[in-house]
Amino acid sequence: MIQSMTGFGKSQLQLAHKKIIIEIKSLNSKAIDLNTRIAQAYKEKELAMRKLISDTLERGKIDFTLTVENTSETSTSSLNESIIRGYIEQMRAISPNGPDVEFLKMAVRMPDALTTPVEEVDEAEYVQIEGQLVIALKHLQAFRCSEGAILQKDFELRIGNIQQLLVQVETLDTERLAAIRSRMEHAVEEIRARVDENRFEQELIFYLEKLDITEEKVRLANHLNYFLSTLEEPQSNGRKLGFIAQEIGREINTLGSKANHAQMQQIVVLMKNELEKIKEQVLNIL
């Protein structure tokens, strides 16, 4: 079962005087690319949280935020009066006739005007936070699975379209080879008397073998089936699907170069169109 790398997970933890909010977002990336924004009080646990996220999600561009909302009726912050007075005095020196009320409004917004005590986080609280992180990760993984199921249906549809086009190639191939043989025989009809018959047949067979696409058709059919079977594997493997898609592309390109038949080349163009859509979506598979 495939998974998308796109996902979102969220969880919340209500404690005595605060609420912890955890959010994780994921987009596609070749490797794990983890960005974190963590409230200062929990910075010492950042490495442990990063490891848990990386081990769980494996790949993707991940944005992880842990924020704290104060739910207490009293504020834990206090005004740093000496610093605020210092700011106001500097403003008065610059503008002696300025209003003190406006100076105060500006001063309380300046750096270090508010003091918030550093909160100690005990191990029991972190265990609860880690539990909520696990829940958020599960929500994100469920999102990835849901997106993966949608992508899988799209892959199956497009692989099926290529398989149907390959059936049309099979139907046209006999006609194509007969037409090529006829054109060649007609082209040399005037000089046939001067050409050894056996030699002519040998050259004709050699040329037709160069245009033969039997092996390409067989390999393409095998690659298409392999892609479908890989979709059903227990573990999502976007890299493997990408490699198979490359092999499918090689066989389709060879069909196009050997075709020498207008209708068959049109079919090859349709195959390439379906494959490009597959390749775009494979980039988002875990």
Locate each region found by the language model.
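N-terminal intrinsically disordered, cationic/polar leader segments
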Residues: 1-286
